[in-house]
């Protein structure tokens, strides 16, 4: 009899804890001002590489962005200095915050490998995805990504904006090149899963991108369109992502590509694409973030960054990435719309809920939504992980 009731008791215990945790998150959100909620849905770029620039105090003011995206210029020449910079940003934002309950930002960057690897000067080398898939065994690839993630995490970073889960021959995606694992679906799936598992082992969350895919037009430069029928769209684009994100609670980064048969608008603005396909058909329960709102693919027709941010959130994106210095402007635009549009306010609450749940998963806040103080940079652990990664690379180049 004991064996029958123990699993049942465990199930109800977990269920009760989940409900309690969700209620705490919801009560935390209800206590936030519209401006604080608006700040949470923004992933902003930031200047500096050594300490938090004092002149940014007035720019950020009393509000803490939900996240920061770091570029190559944000990393110093040593891991110690880079970790100190990230710590300085977090501490400075906390001092500036006037929130009753401070919610720390998470830090994200691109660590795909090869030409897209922001810490190449201070960490072990990470080859391009194509090289890894062609030259490393599954075990070596997993170990390499694990040890790379350990270094990334020790710097104070939480989210890797990778891997790219796309096929190179689909619509001739030439501009991505060796950033793709392969042209073969099975190899892409195998090494994408290895990448995500390795990052997780090392303490890093992965954002699979760029859902639902790309064509041979770089959205940084101009409008991009997937002009195919529904059957081809699912077979050549969505099915790859489905294998990775079905019933998942991770992170998905949305492309700016347009899919006309769904809606003649960038996918990040398409409620039919995000809600009907990603949420409903693929059962994705995690965090949805956009690519950079500053890309030229979104600027056509005279649209402003503010317009784009509102459109992306309204469509179902939880967090918008913006490398332009528009933090205060965007907070004002978002919070003003919340005050006059009940459905938009509800959408923001849903987005902030997903963000806070992800921050719990990242270990940034606890079940009570209180900040968790992480350990300081550990030089010994960093160089140990760096050495372990370099040994794997050396073995595979001899």
Regions found by a protein language model. Name each.
Residues 121, 125, 129-130, 146-235, ...:
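Surface-exposed loop and adjacent secondary-structure segments within mature catalytic domains
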Residues 7-17:
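Bacterial N-terminal signal peptides
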Residues 19-121, 389, 393-398:
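N-terminal hydrophobic targeting/anchoring segments and the immediately downstream early-domain regions
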Residues 41-51, 130-142, 222-235, 296-302:
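Active-site mouth loops of central-metabolism enzymes
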Residues 39-46, 66-70, 105-111, 159-163, ...:
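Hydrophobic faces of well-ordered beta-strands that scaffold small-molecule active sites
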Residues 1-4:
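Positively charged n-region of N-terminal signal peptides that target proteins for export
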Residues 21-62, 271, 281, 300-398:
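Preference for extracellular/luminal or secreted protein segments
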Residues 33, 59, 78-94, 98-101, ...:
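Second-shell residues forming the walls of enzyme active-site clefts
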